[in-house]
């Protein structure tokens, strides 16, 4: 994928940035594509960098993701909770699986979706092969993760754990309006809500 370069005029002449580095200057992190350990490490590094720059200023995490590895997503989530800077989440396109979980984990009152975005929640997926004992160990672990994710999603949405558990048994797709009613987001936006962004 070709990453666009942005050229800016400064007092010392021209300076060029890749588009993601330029967005980072405005405290915007873009999470696009599947979530794996490499993606998680990049997002976490950006969160920690922005926290060090100004722990009181909002960070804006734009999400367009089909989800991915649970442990990688949880690493991002835990870092969002760990830092002092509030993290606003904005769904553009889709936030599915771990993407939806991260969307719900943004700062209360600052979780958004664009009009035509879709959000999908479901139980964690897993596959393992090997000895029966190892399969049993992994099955227990995925059930533990499922309970943990359901409890956290219930906490962020205001839904009961029982409702979340029932809804995540299969893929549960929502429009922005449905996600708002569910409690995953706080508002649907048609205009930029990021202070300092292009309105």
Curated annotation (Swiss-Prot):
Q: Is Hydrolase among this UniProt entry's keywords?
A: yes
Catalytic activity, reaction form: Hydrolysis of proteins to small peptides in the presence of ATP and magnesium. alpha-casein is the usual test substrate. In the absence of ATP, only oligopeptides shorter than five residues are hydrolyzed (such as succinyl-Leu-Tyr-|-NHMec, and Leu-Tyr-Leu-|-Tyr-Trp, in which cleavage of the -Tyr-|-Leu- and -Tyr-|-Trp bonds also occurs)
Regions that span the bilayer: none
Q: Name one GO biological process term.
A: protein quality control for misfolded or incompletely synthesized proteins
Task: Show the active-site residues.
Answer: 97 (nucleophile), 122
User: Which cysteines does the record link by disulfide bonds?
Assistant: none
Q: Name one GO cellular component term.
A: endopeptidase Clp complex
Q: Which CDD domains match?
A: S14_ClpP_2 (cd07017)
User: What keywords sit in the KW lines?
Assistant: Cytoplasm, Hydrolase, Protease, Serine protease
**What are this entry's molecular-function GO terms?**
ATP-dependent peptidase activity; ATPase binding; serine-type endopeptidase activity
Write down the top EC class of this protein: hydrolase
Q: In this entry, which stretches build a coiled coil?
A: none
Q: Where in the cell is it found?
A: Cytoplasm
Q: State the EC number(s).
A: 3.4.21.92
Described purpose of this protein according to its UniProt entry: Cleaves peptides in various proteins in a process that requires ATP hydrolysis. Has a chymotrypsin-like activity. Plays a major role in the degradation of misfolded proteins.
The record ties this protein, via HAMAP family, to: ClpP (MF_00444)
Oligomeric and partner information = Fourteen ClpP subunits assemble into 2 heptameric rings which stack back to back to give a disk-like structure with a central cavity, resembling the structure of eukaryotic proteasomes.
Q: What is this protein called?
A: ATP-dependent Clp protease proteolytic subunit
State the species of origin: Geobacter sp. (strain M21)
């Amino acid at each position: 994928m070709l990453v666009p370069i942005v050229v800016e005029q400064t007092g010392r002449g021209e300076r060029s940035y890749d588009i993601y580095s330029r967005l980072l200057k405005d405290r915007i992190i873009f999470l696009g594509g599947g979530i794996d350990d490499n993606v998680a490490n990049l997002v976490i590094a950006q969160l920690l960098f922005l926290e060090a720059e100004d722990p009181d200023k909002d960070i804006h995490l734009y999400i367009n993701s089909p989800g991915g590895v649970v442990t990688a997503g949880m690493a991002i989530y835990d870092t969002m909770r760990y830092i002092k800077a509030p993290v606003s989440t904005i769904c553009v396109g889709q936030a599915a699986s771990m993407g939806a979980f991260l969307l719900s984990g943004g700062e209360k009152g600052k979780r958004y979706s664009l009009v035509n975005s879709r959000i999908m929640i479901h139980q964690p997926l897993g596959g393992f092969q090997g000895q029966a004992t190892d399969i049993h160990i992994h099955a227990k672990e995925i059930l533990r993760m499922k309970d943990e994710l359901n409890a956290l999603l219930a906490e962020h949405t205001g839904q009961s754990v029982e409702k979340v558990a029932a809804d995540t048994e299969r893929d549960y797709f929502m429009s922005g309006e449905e996600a708002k009613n569910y409690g995953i987001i706080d508002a649907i936006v048609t205009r930029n809500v990021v202070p300092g962004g292009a309105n």
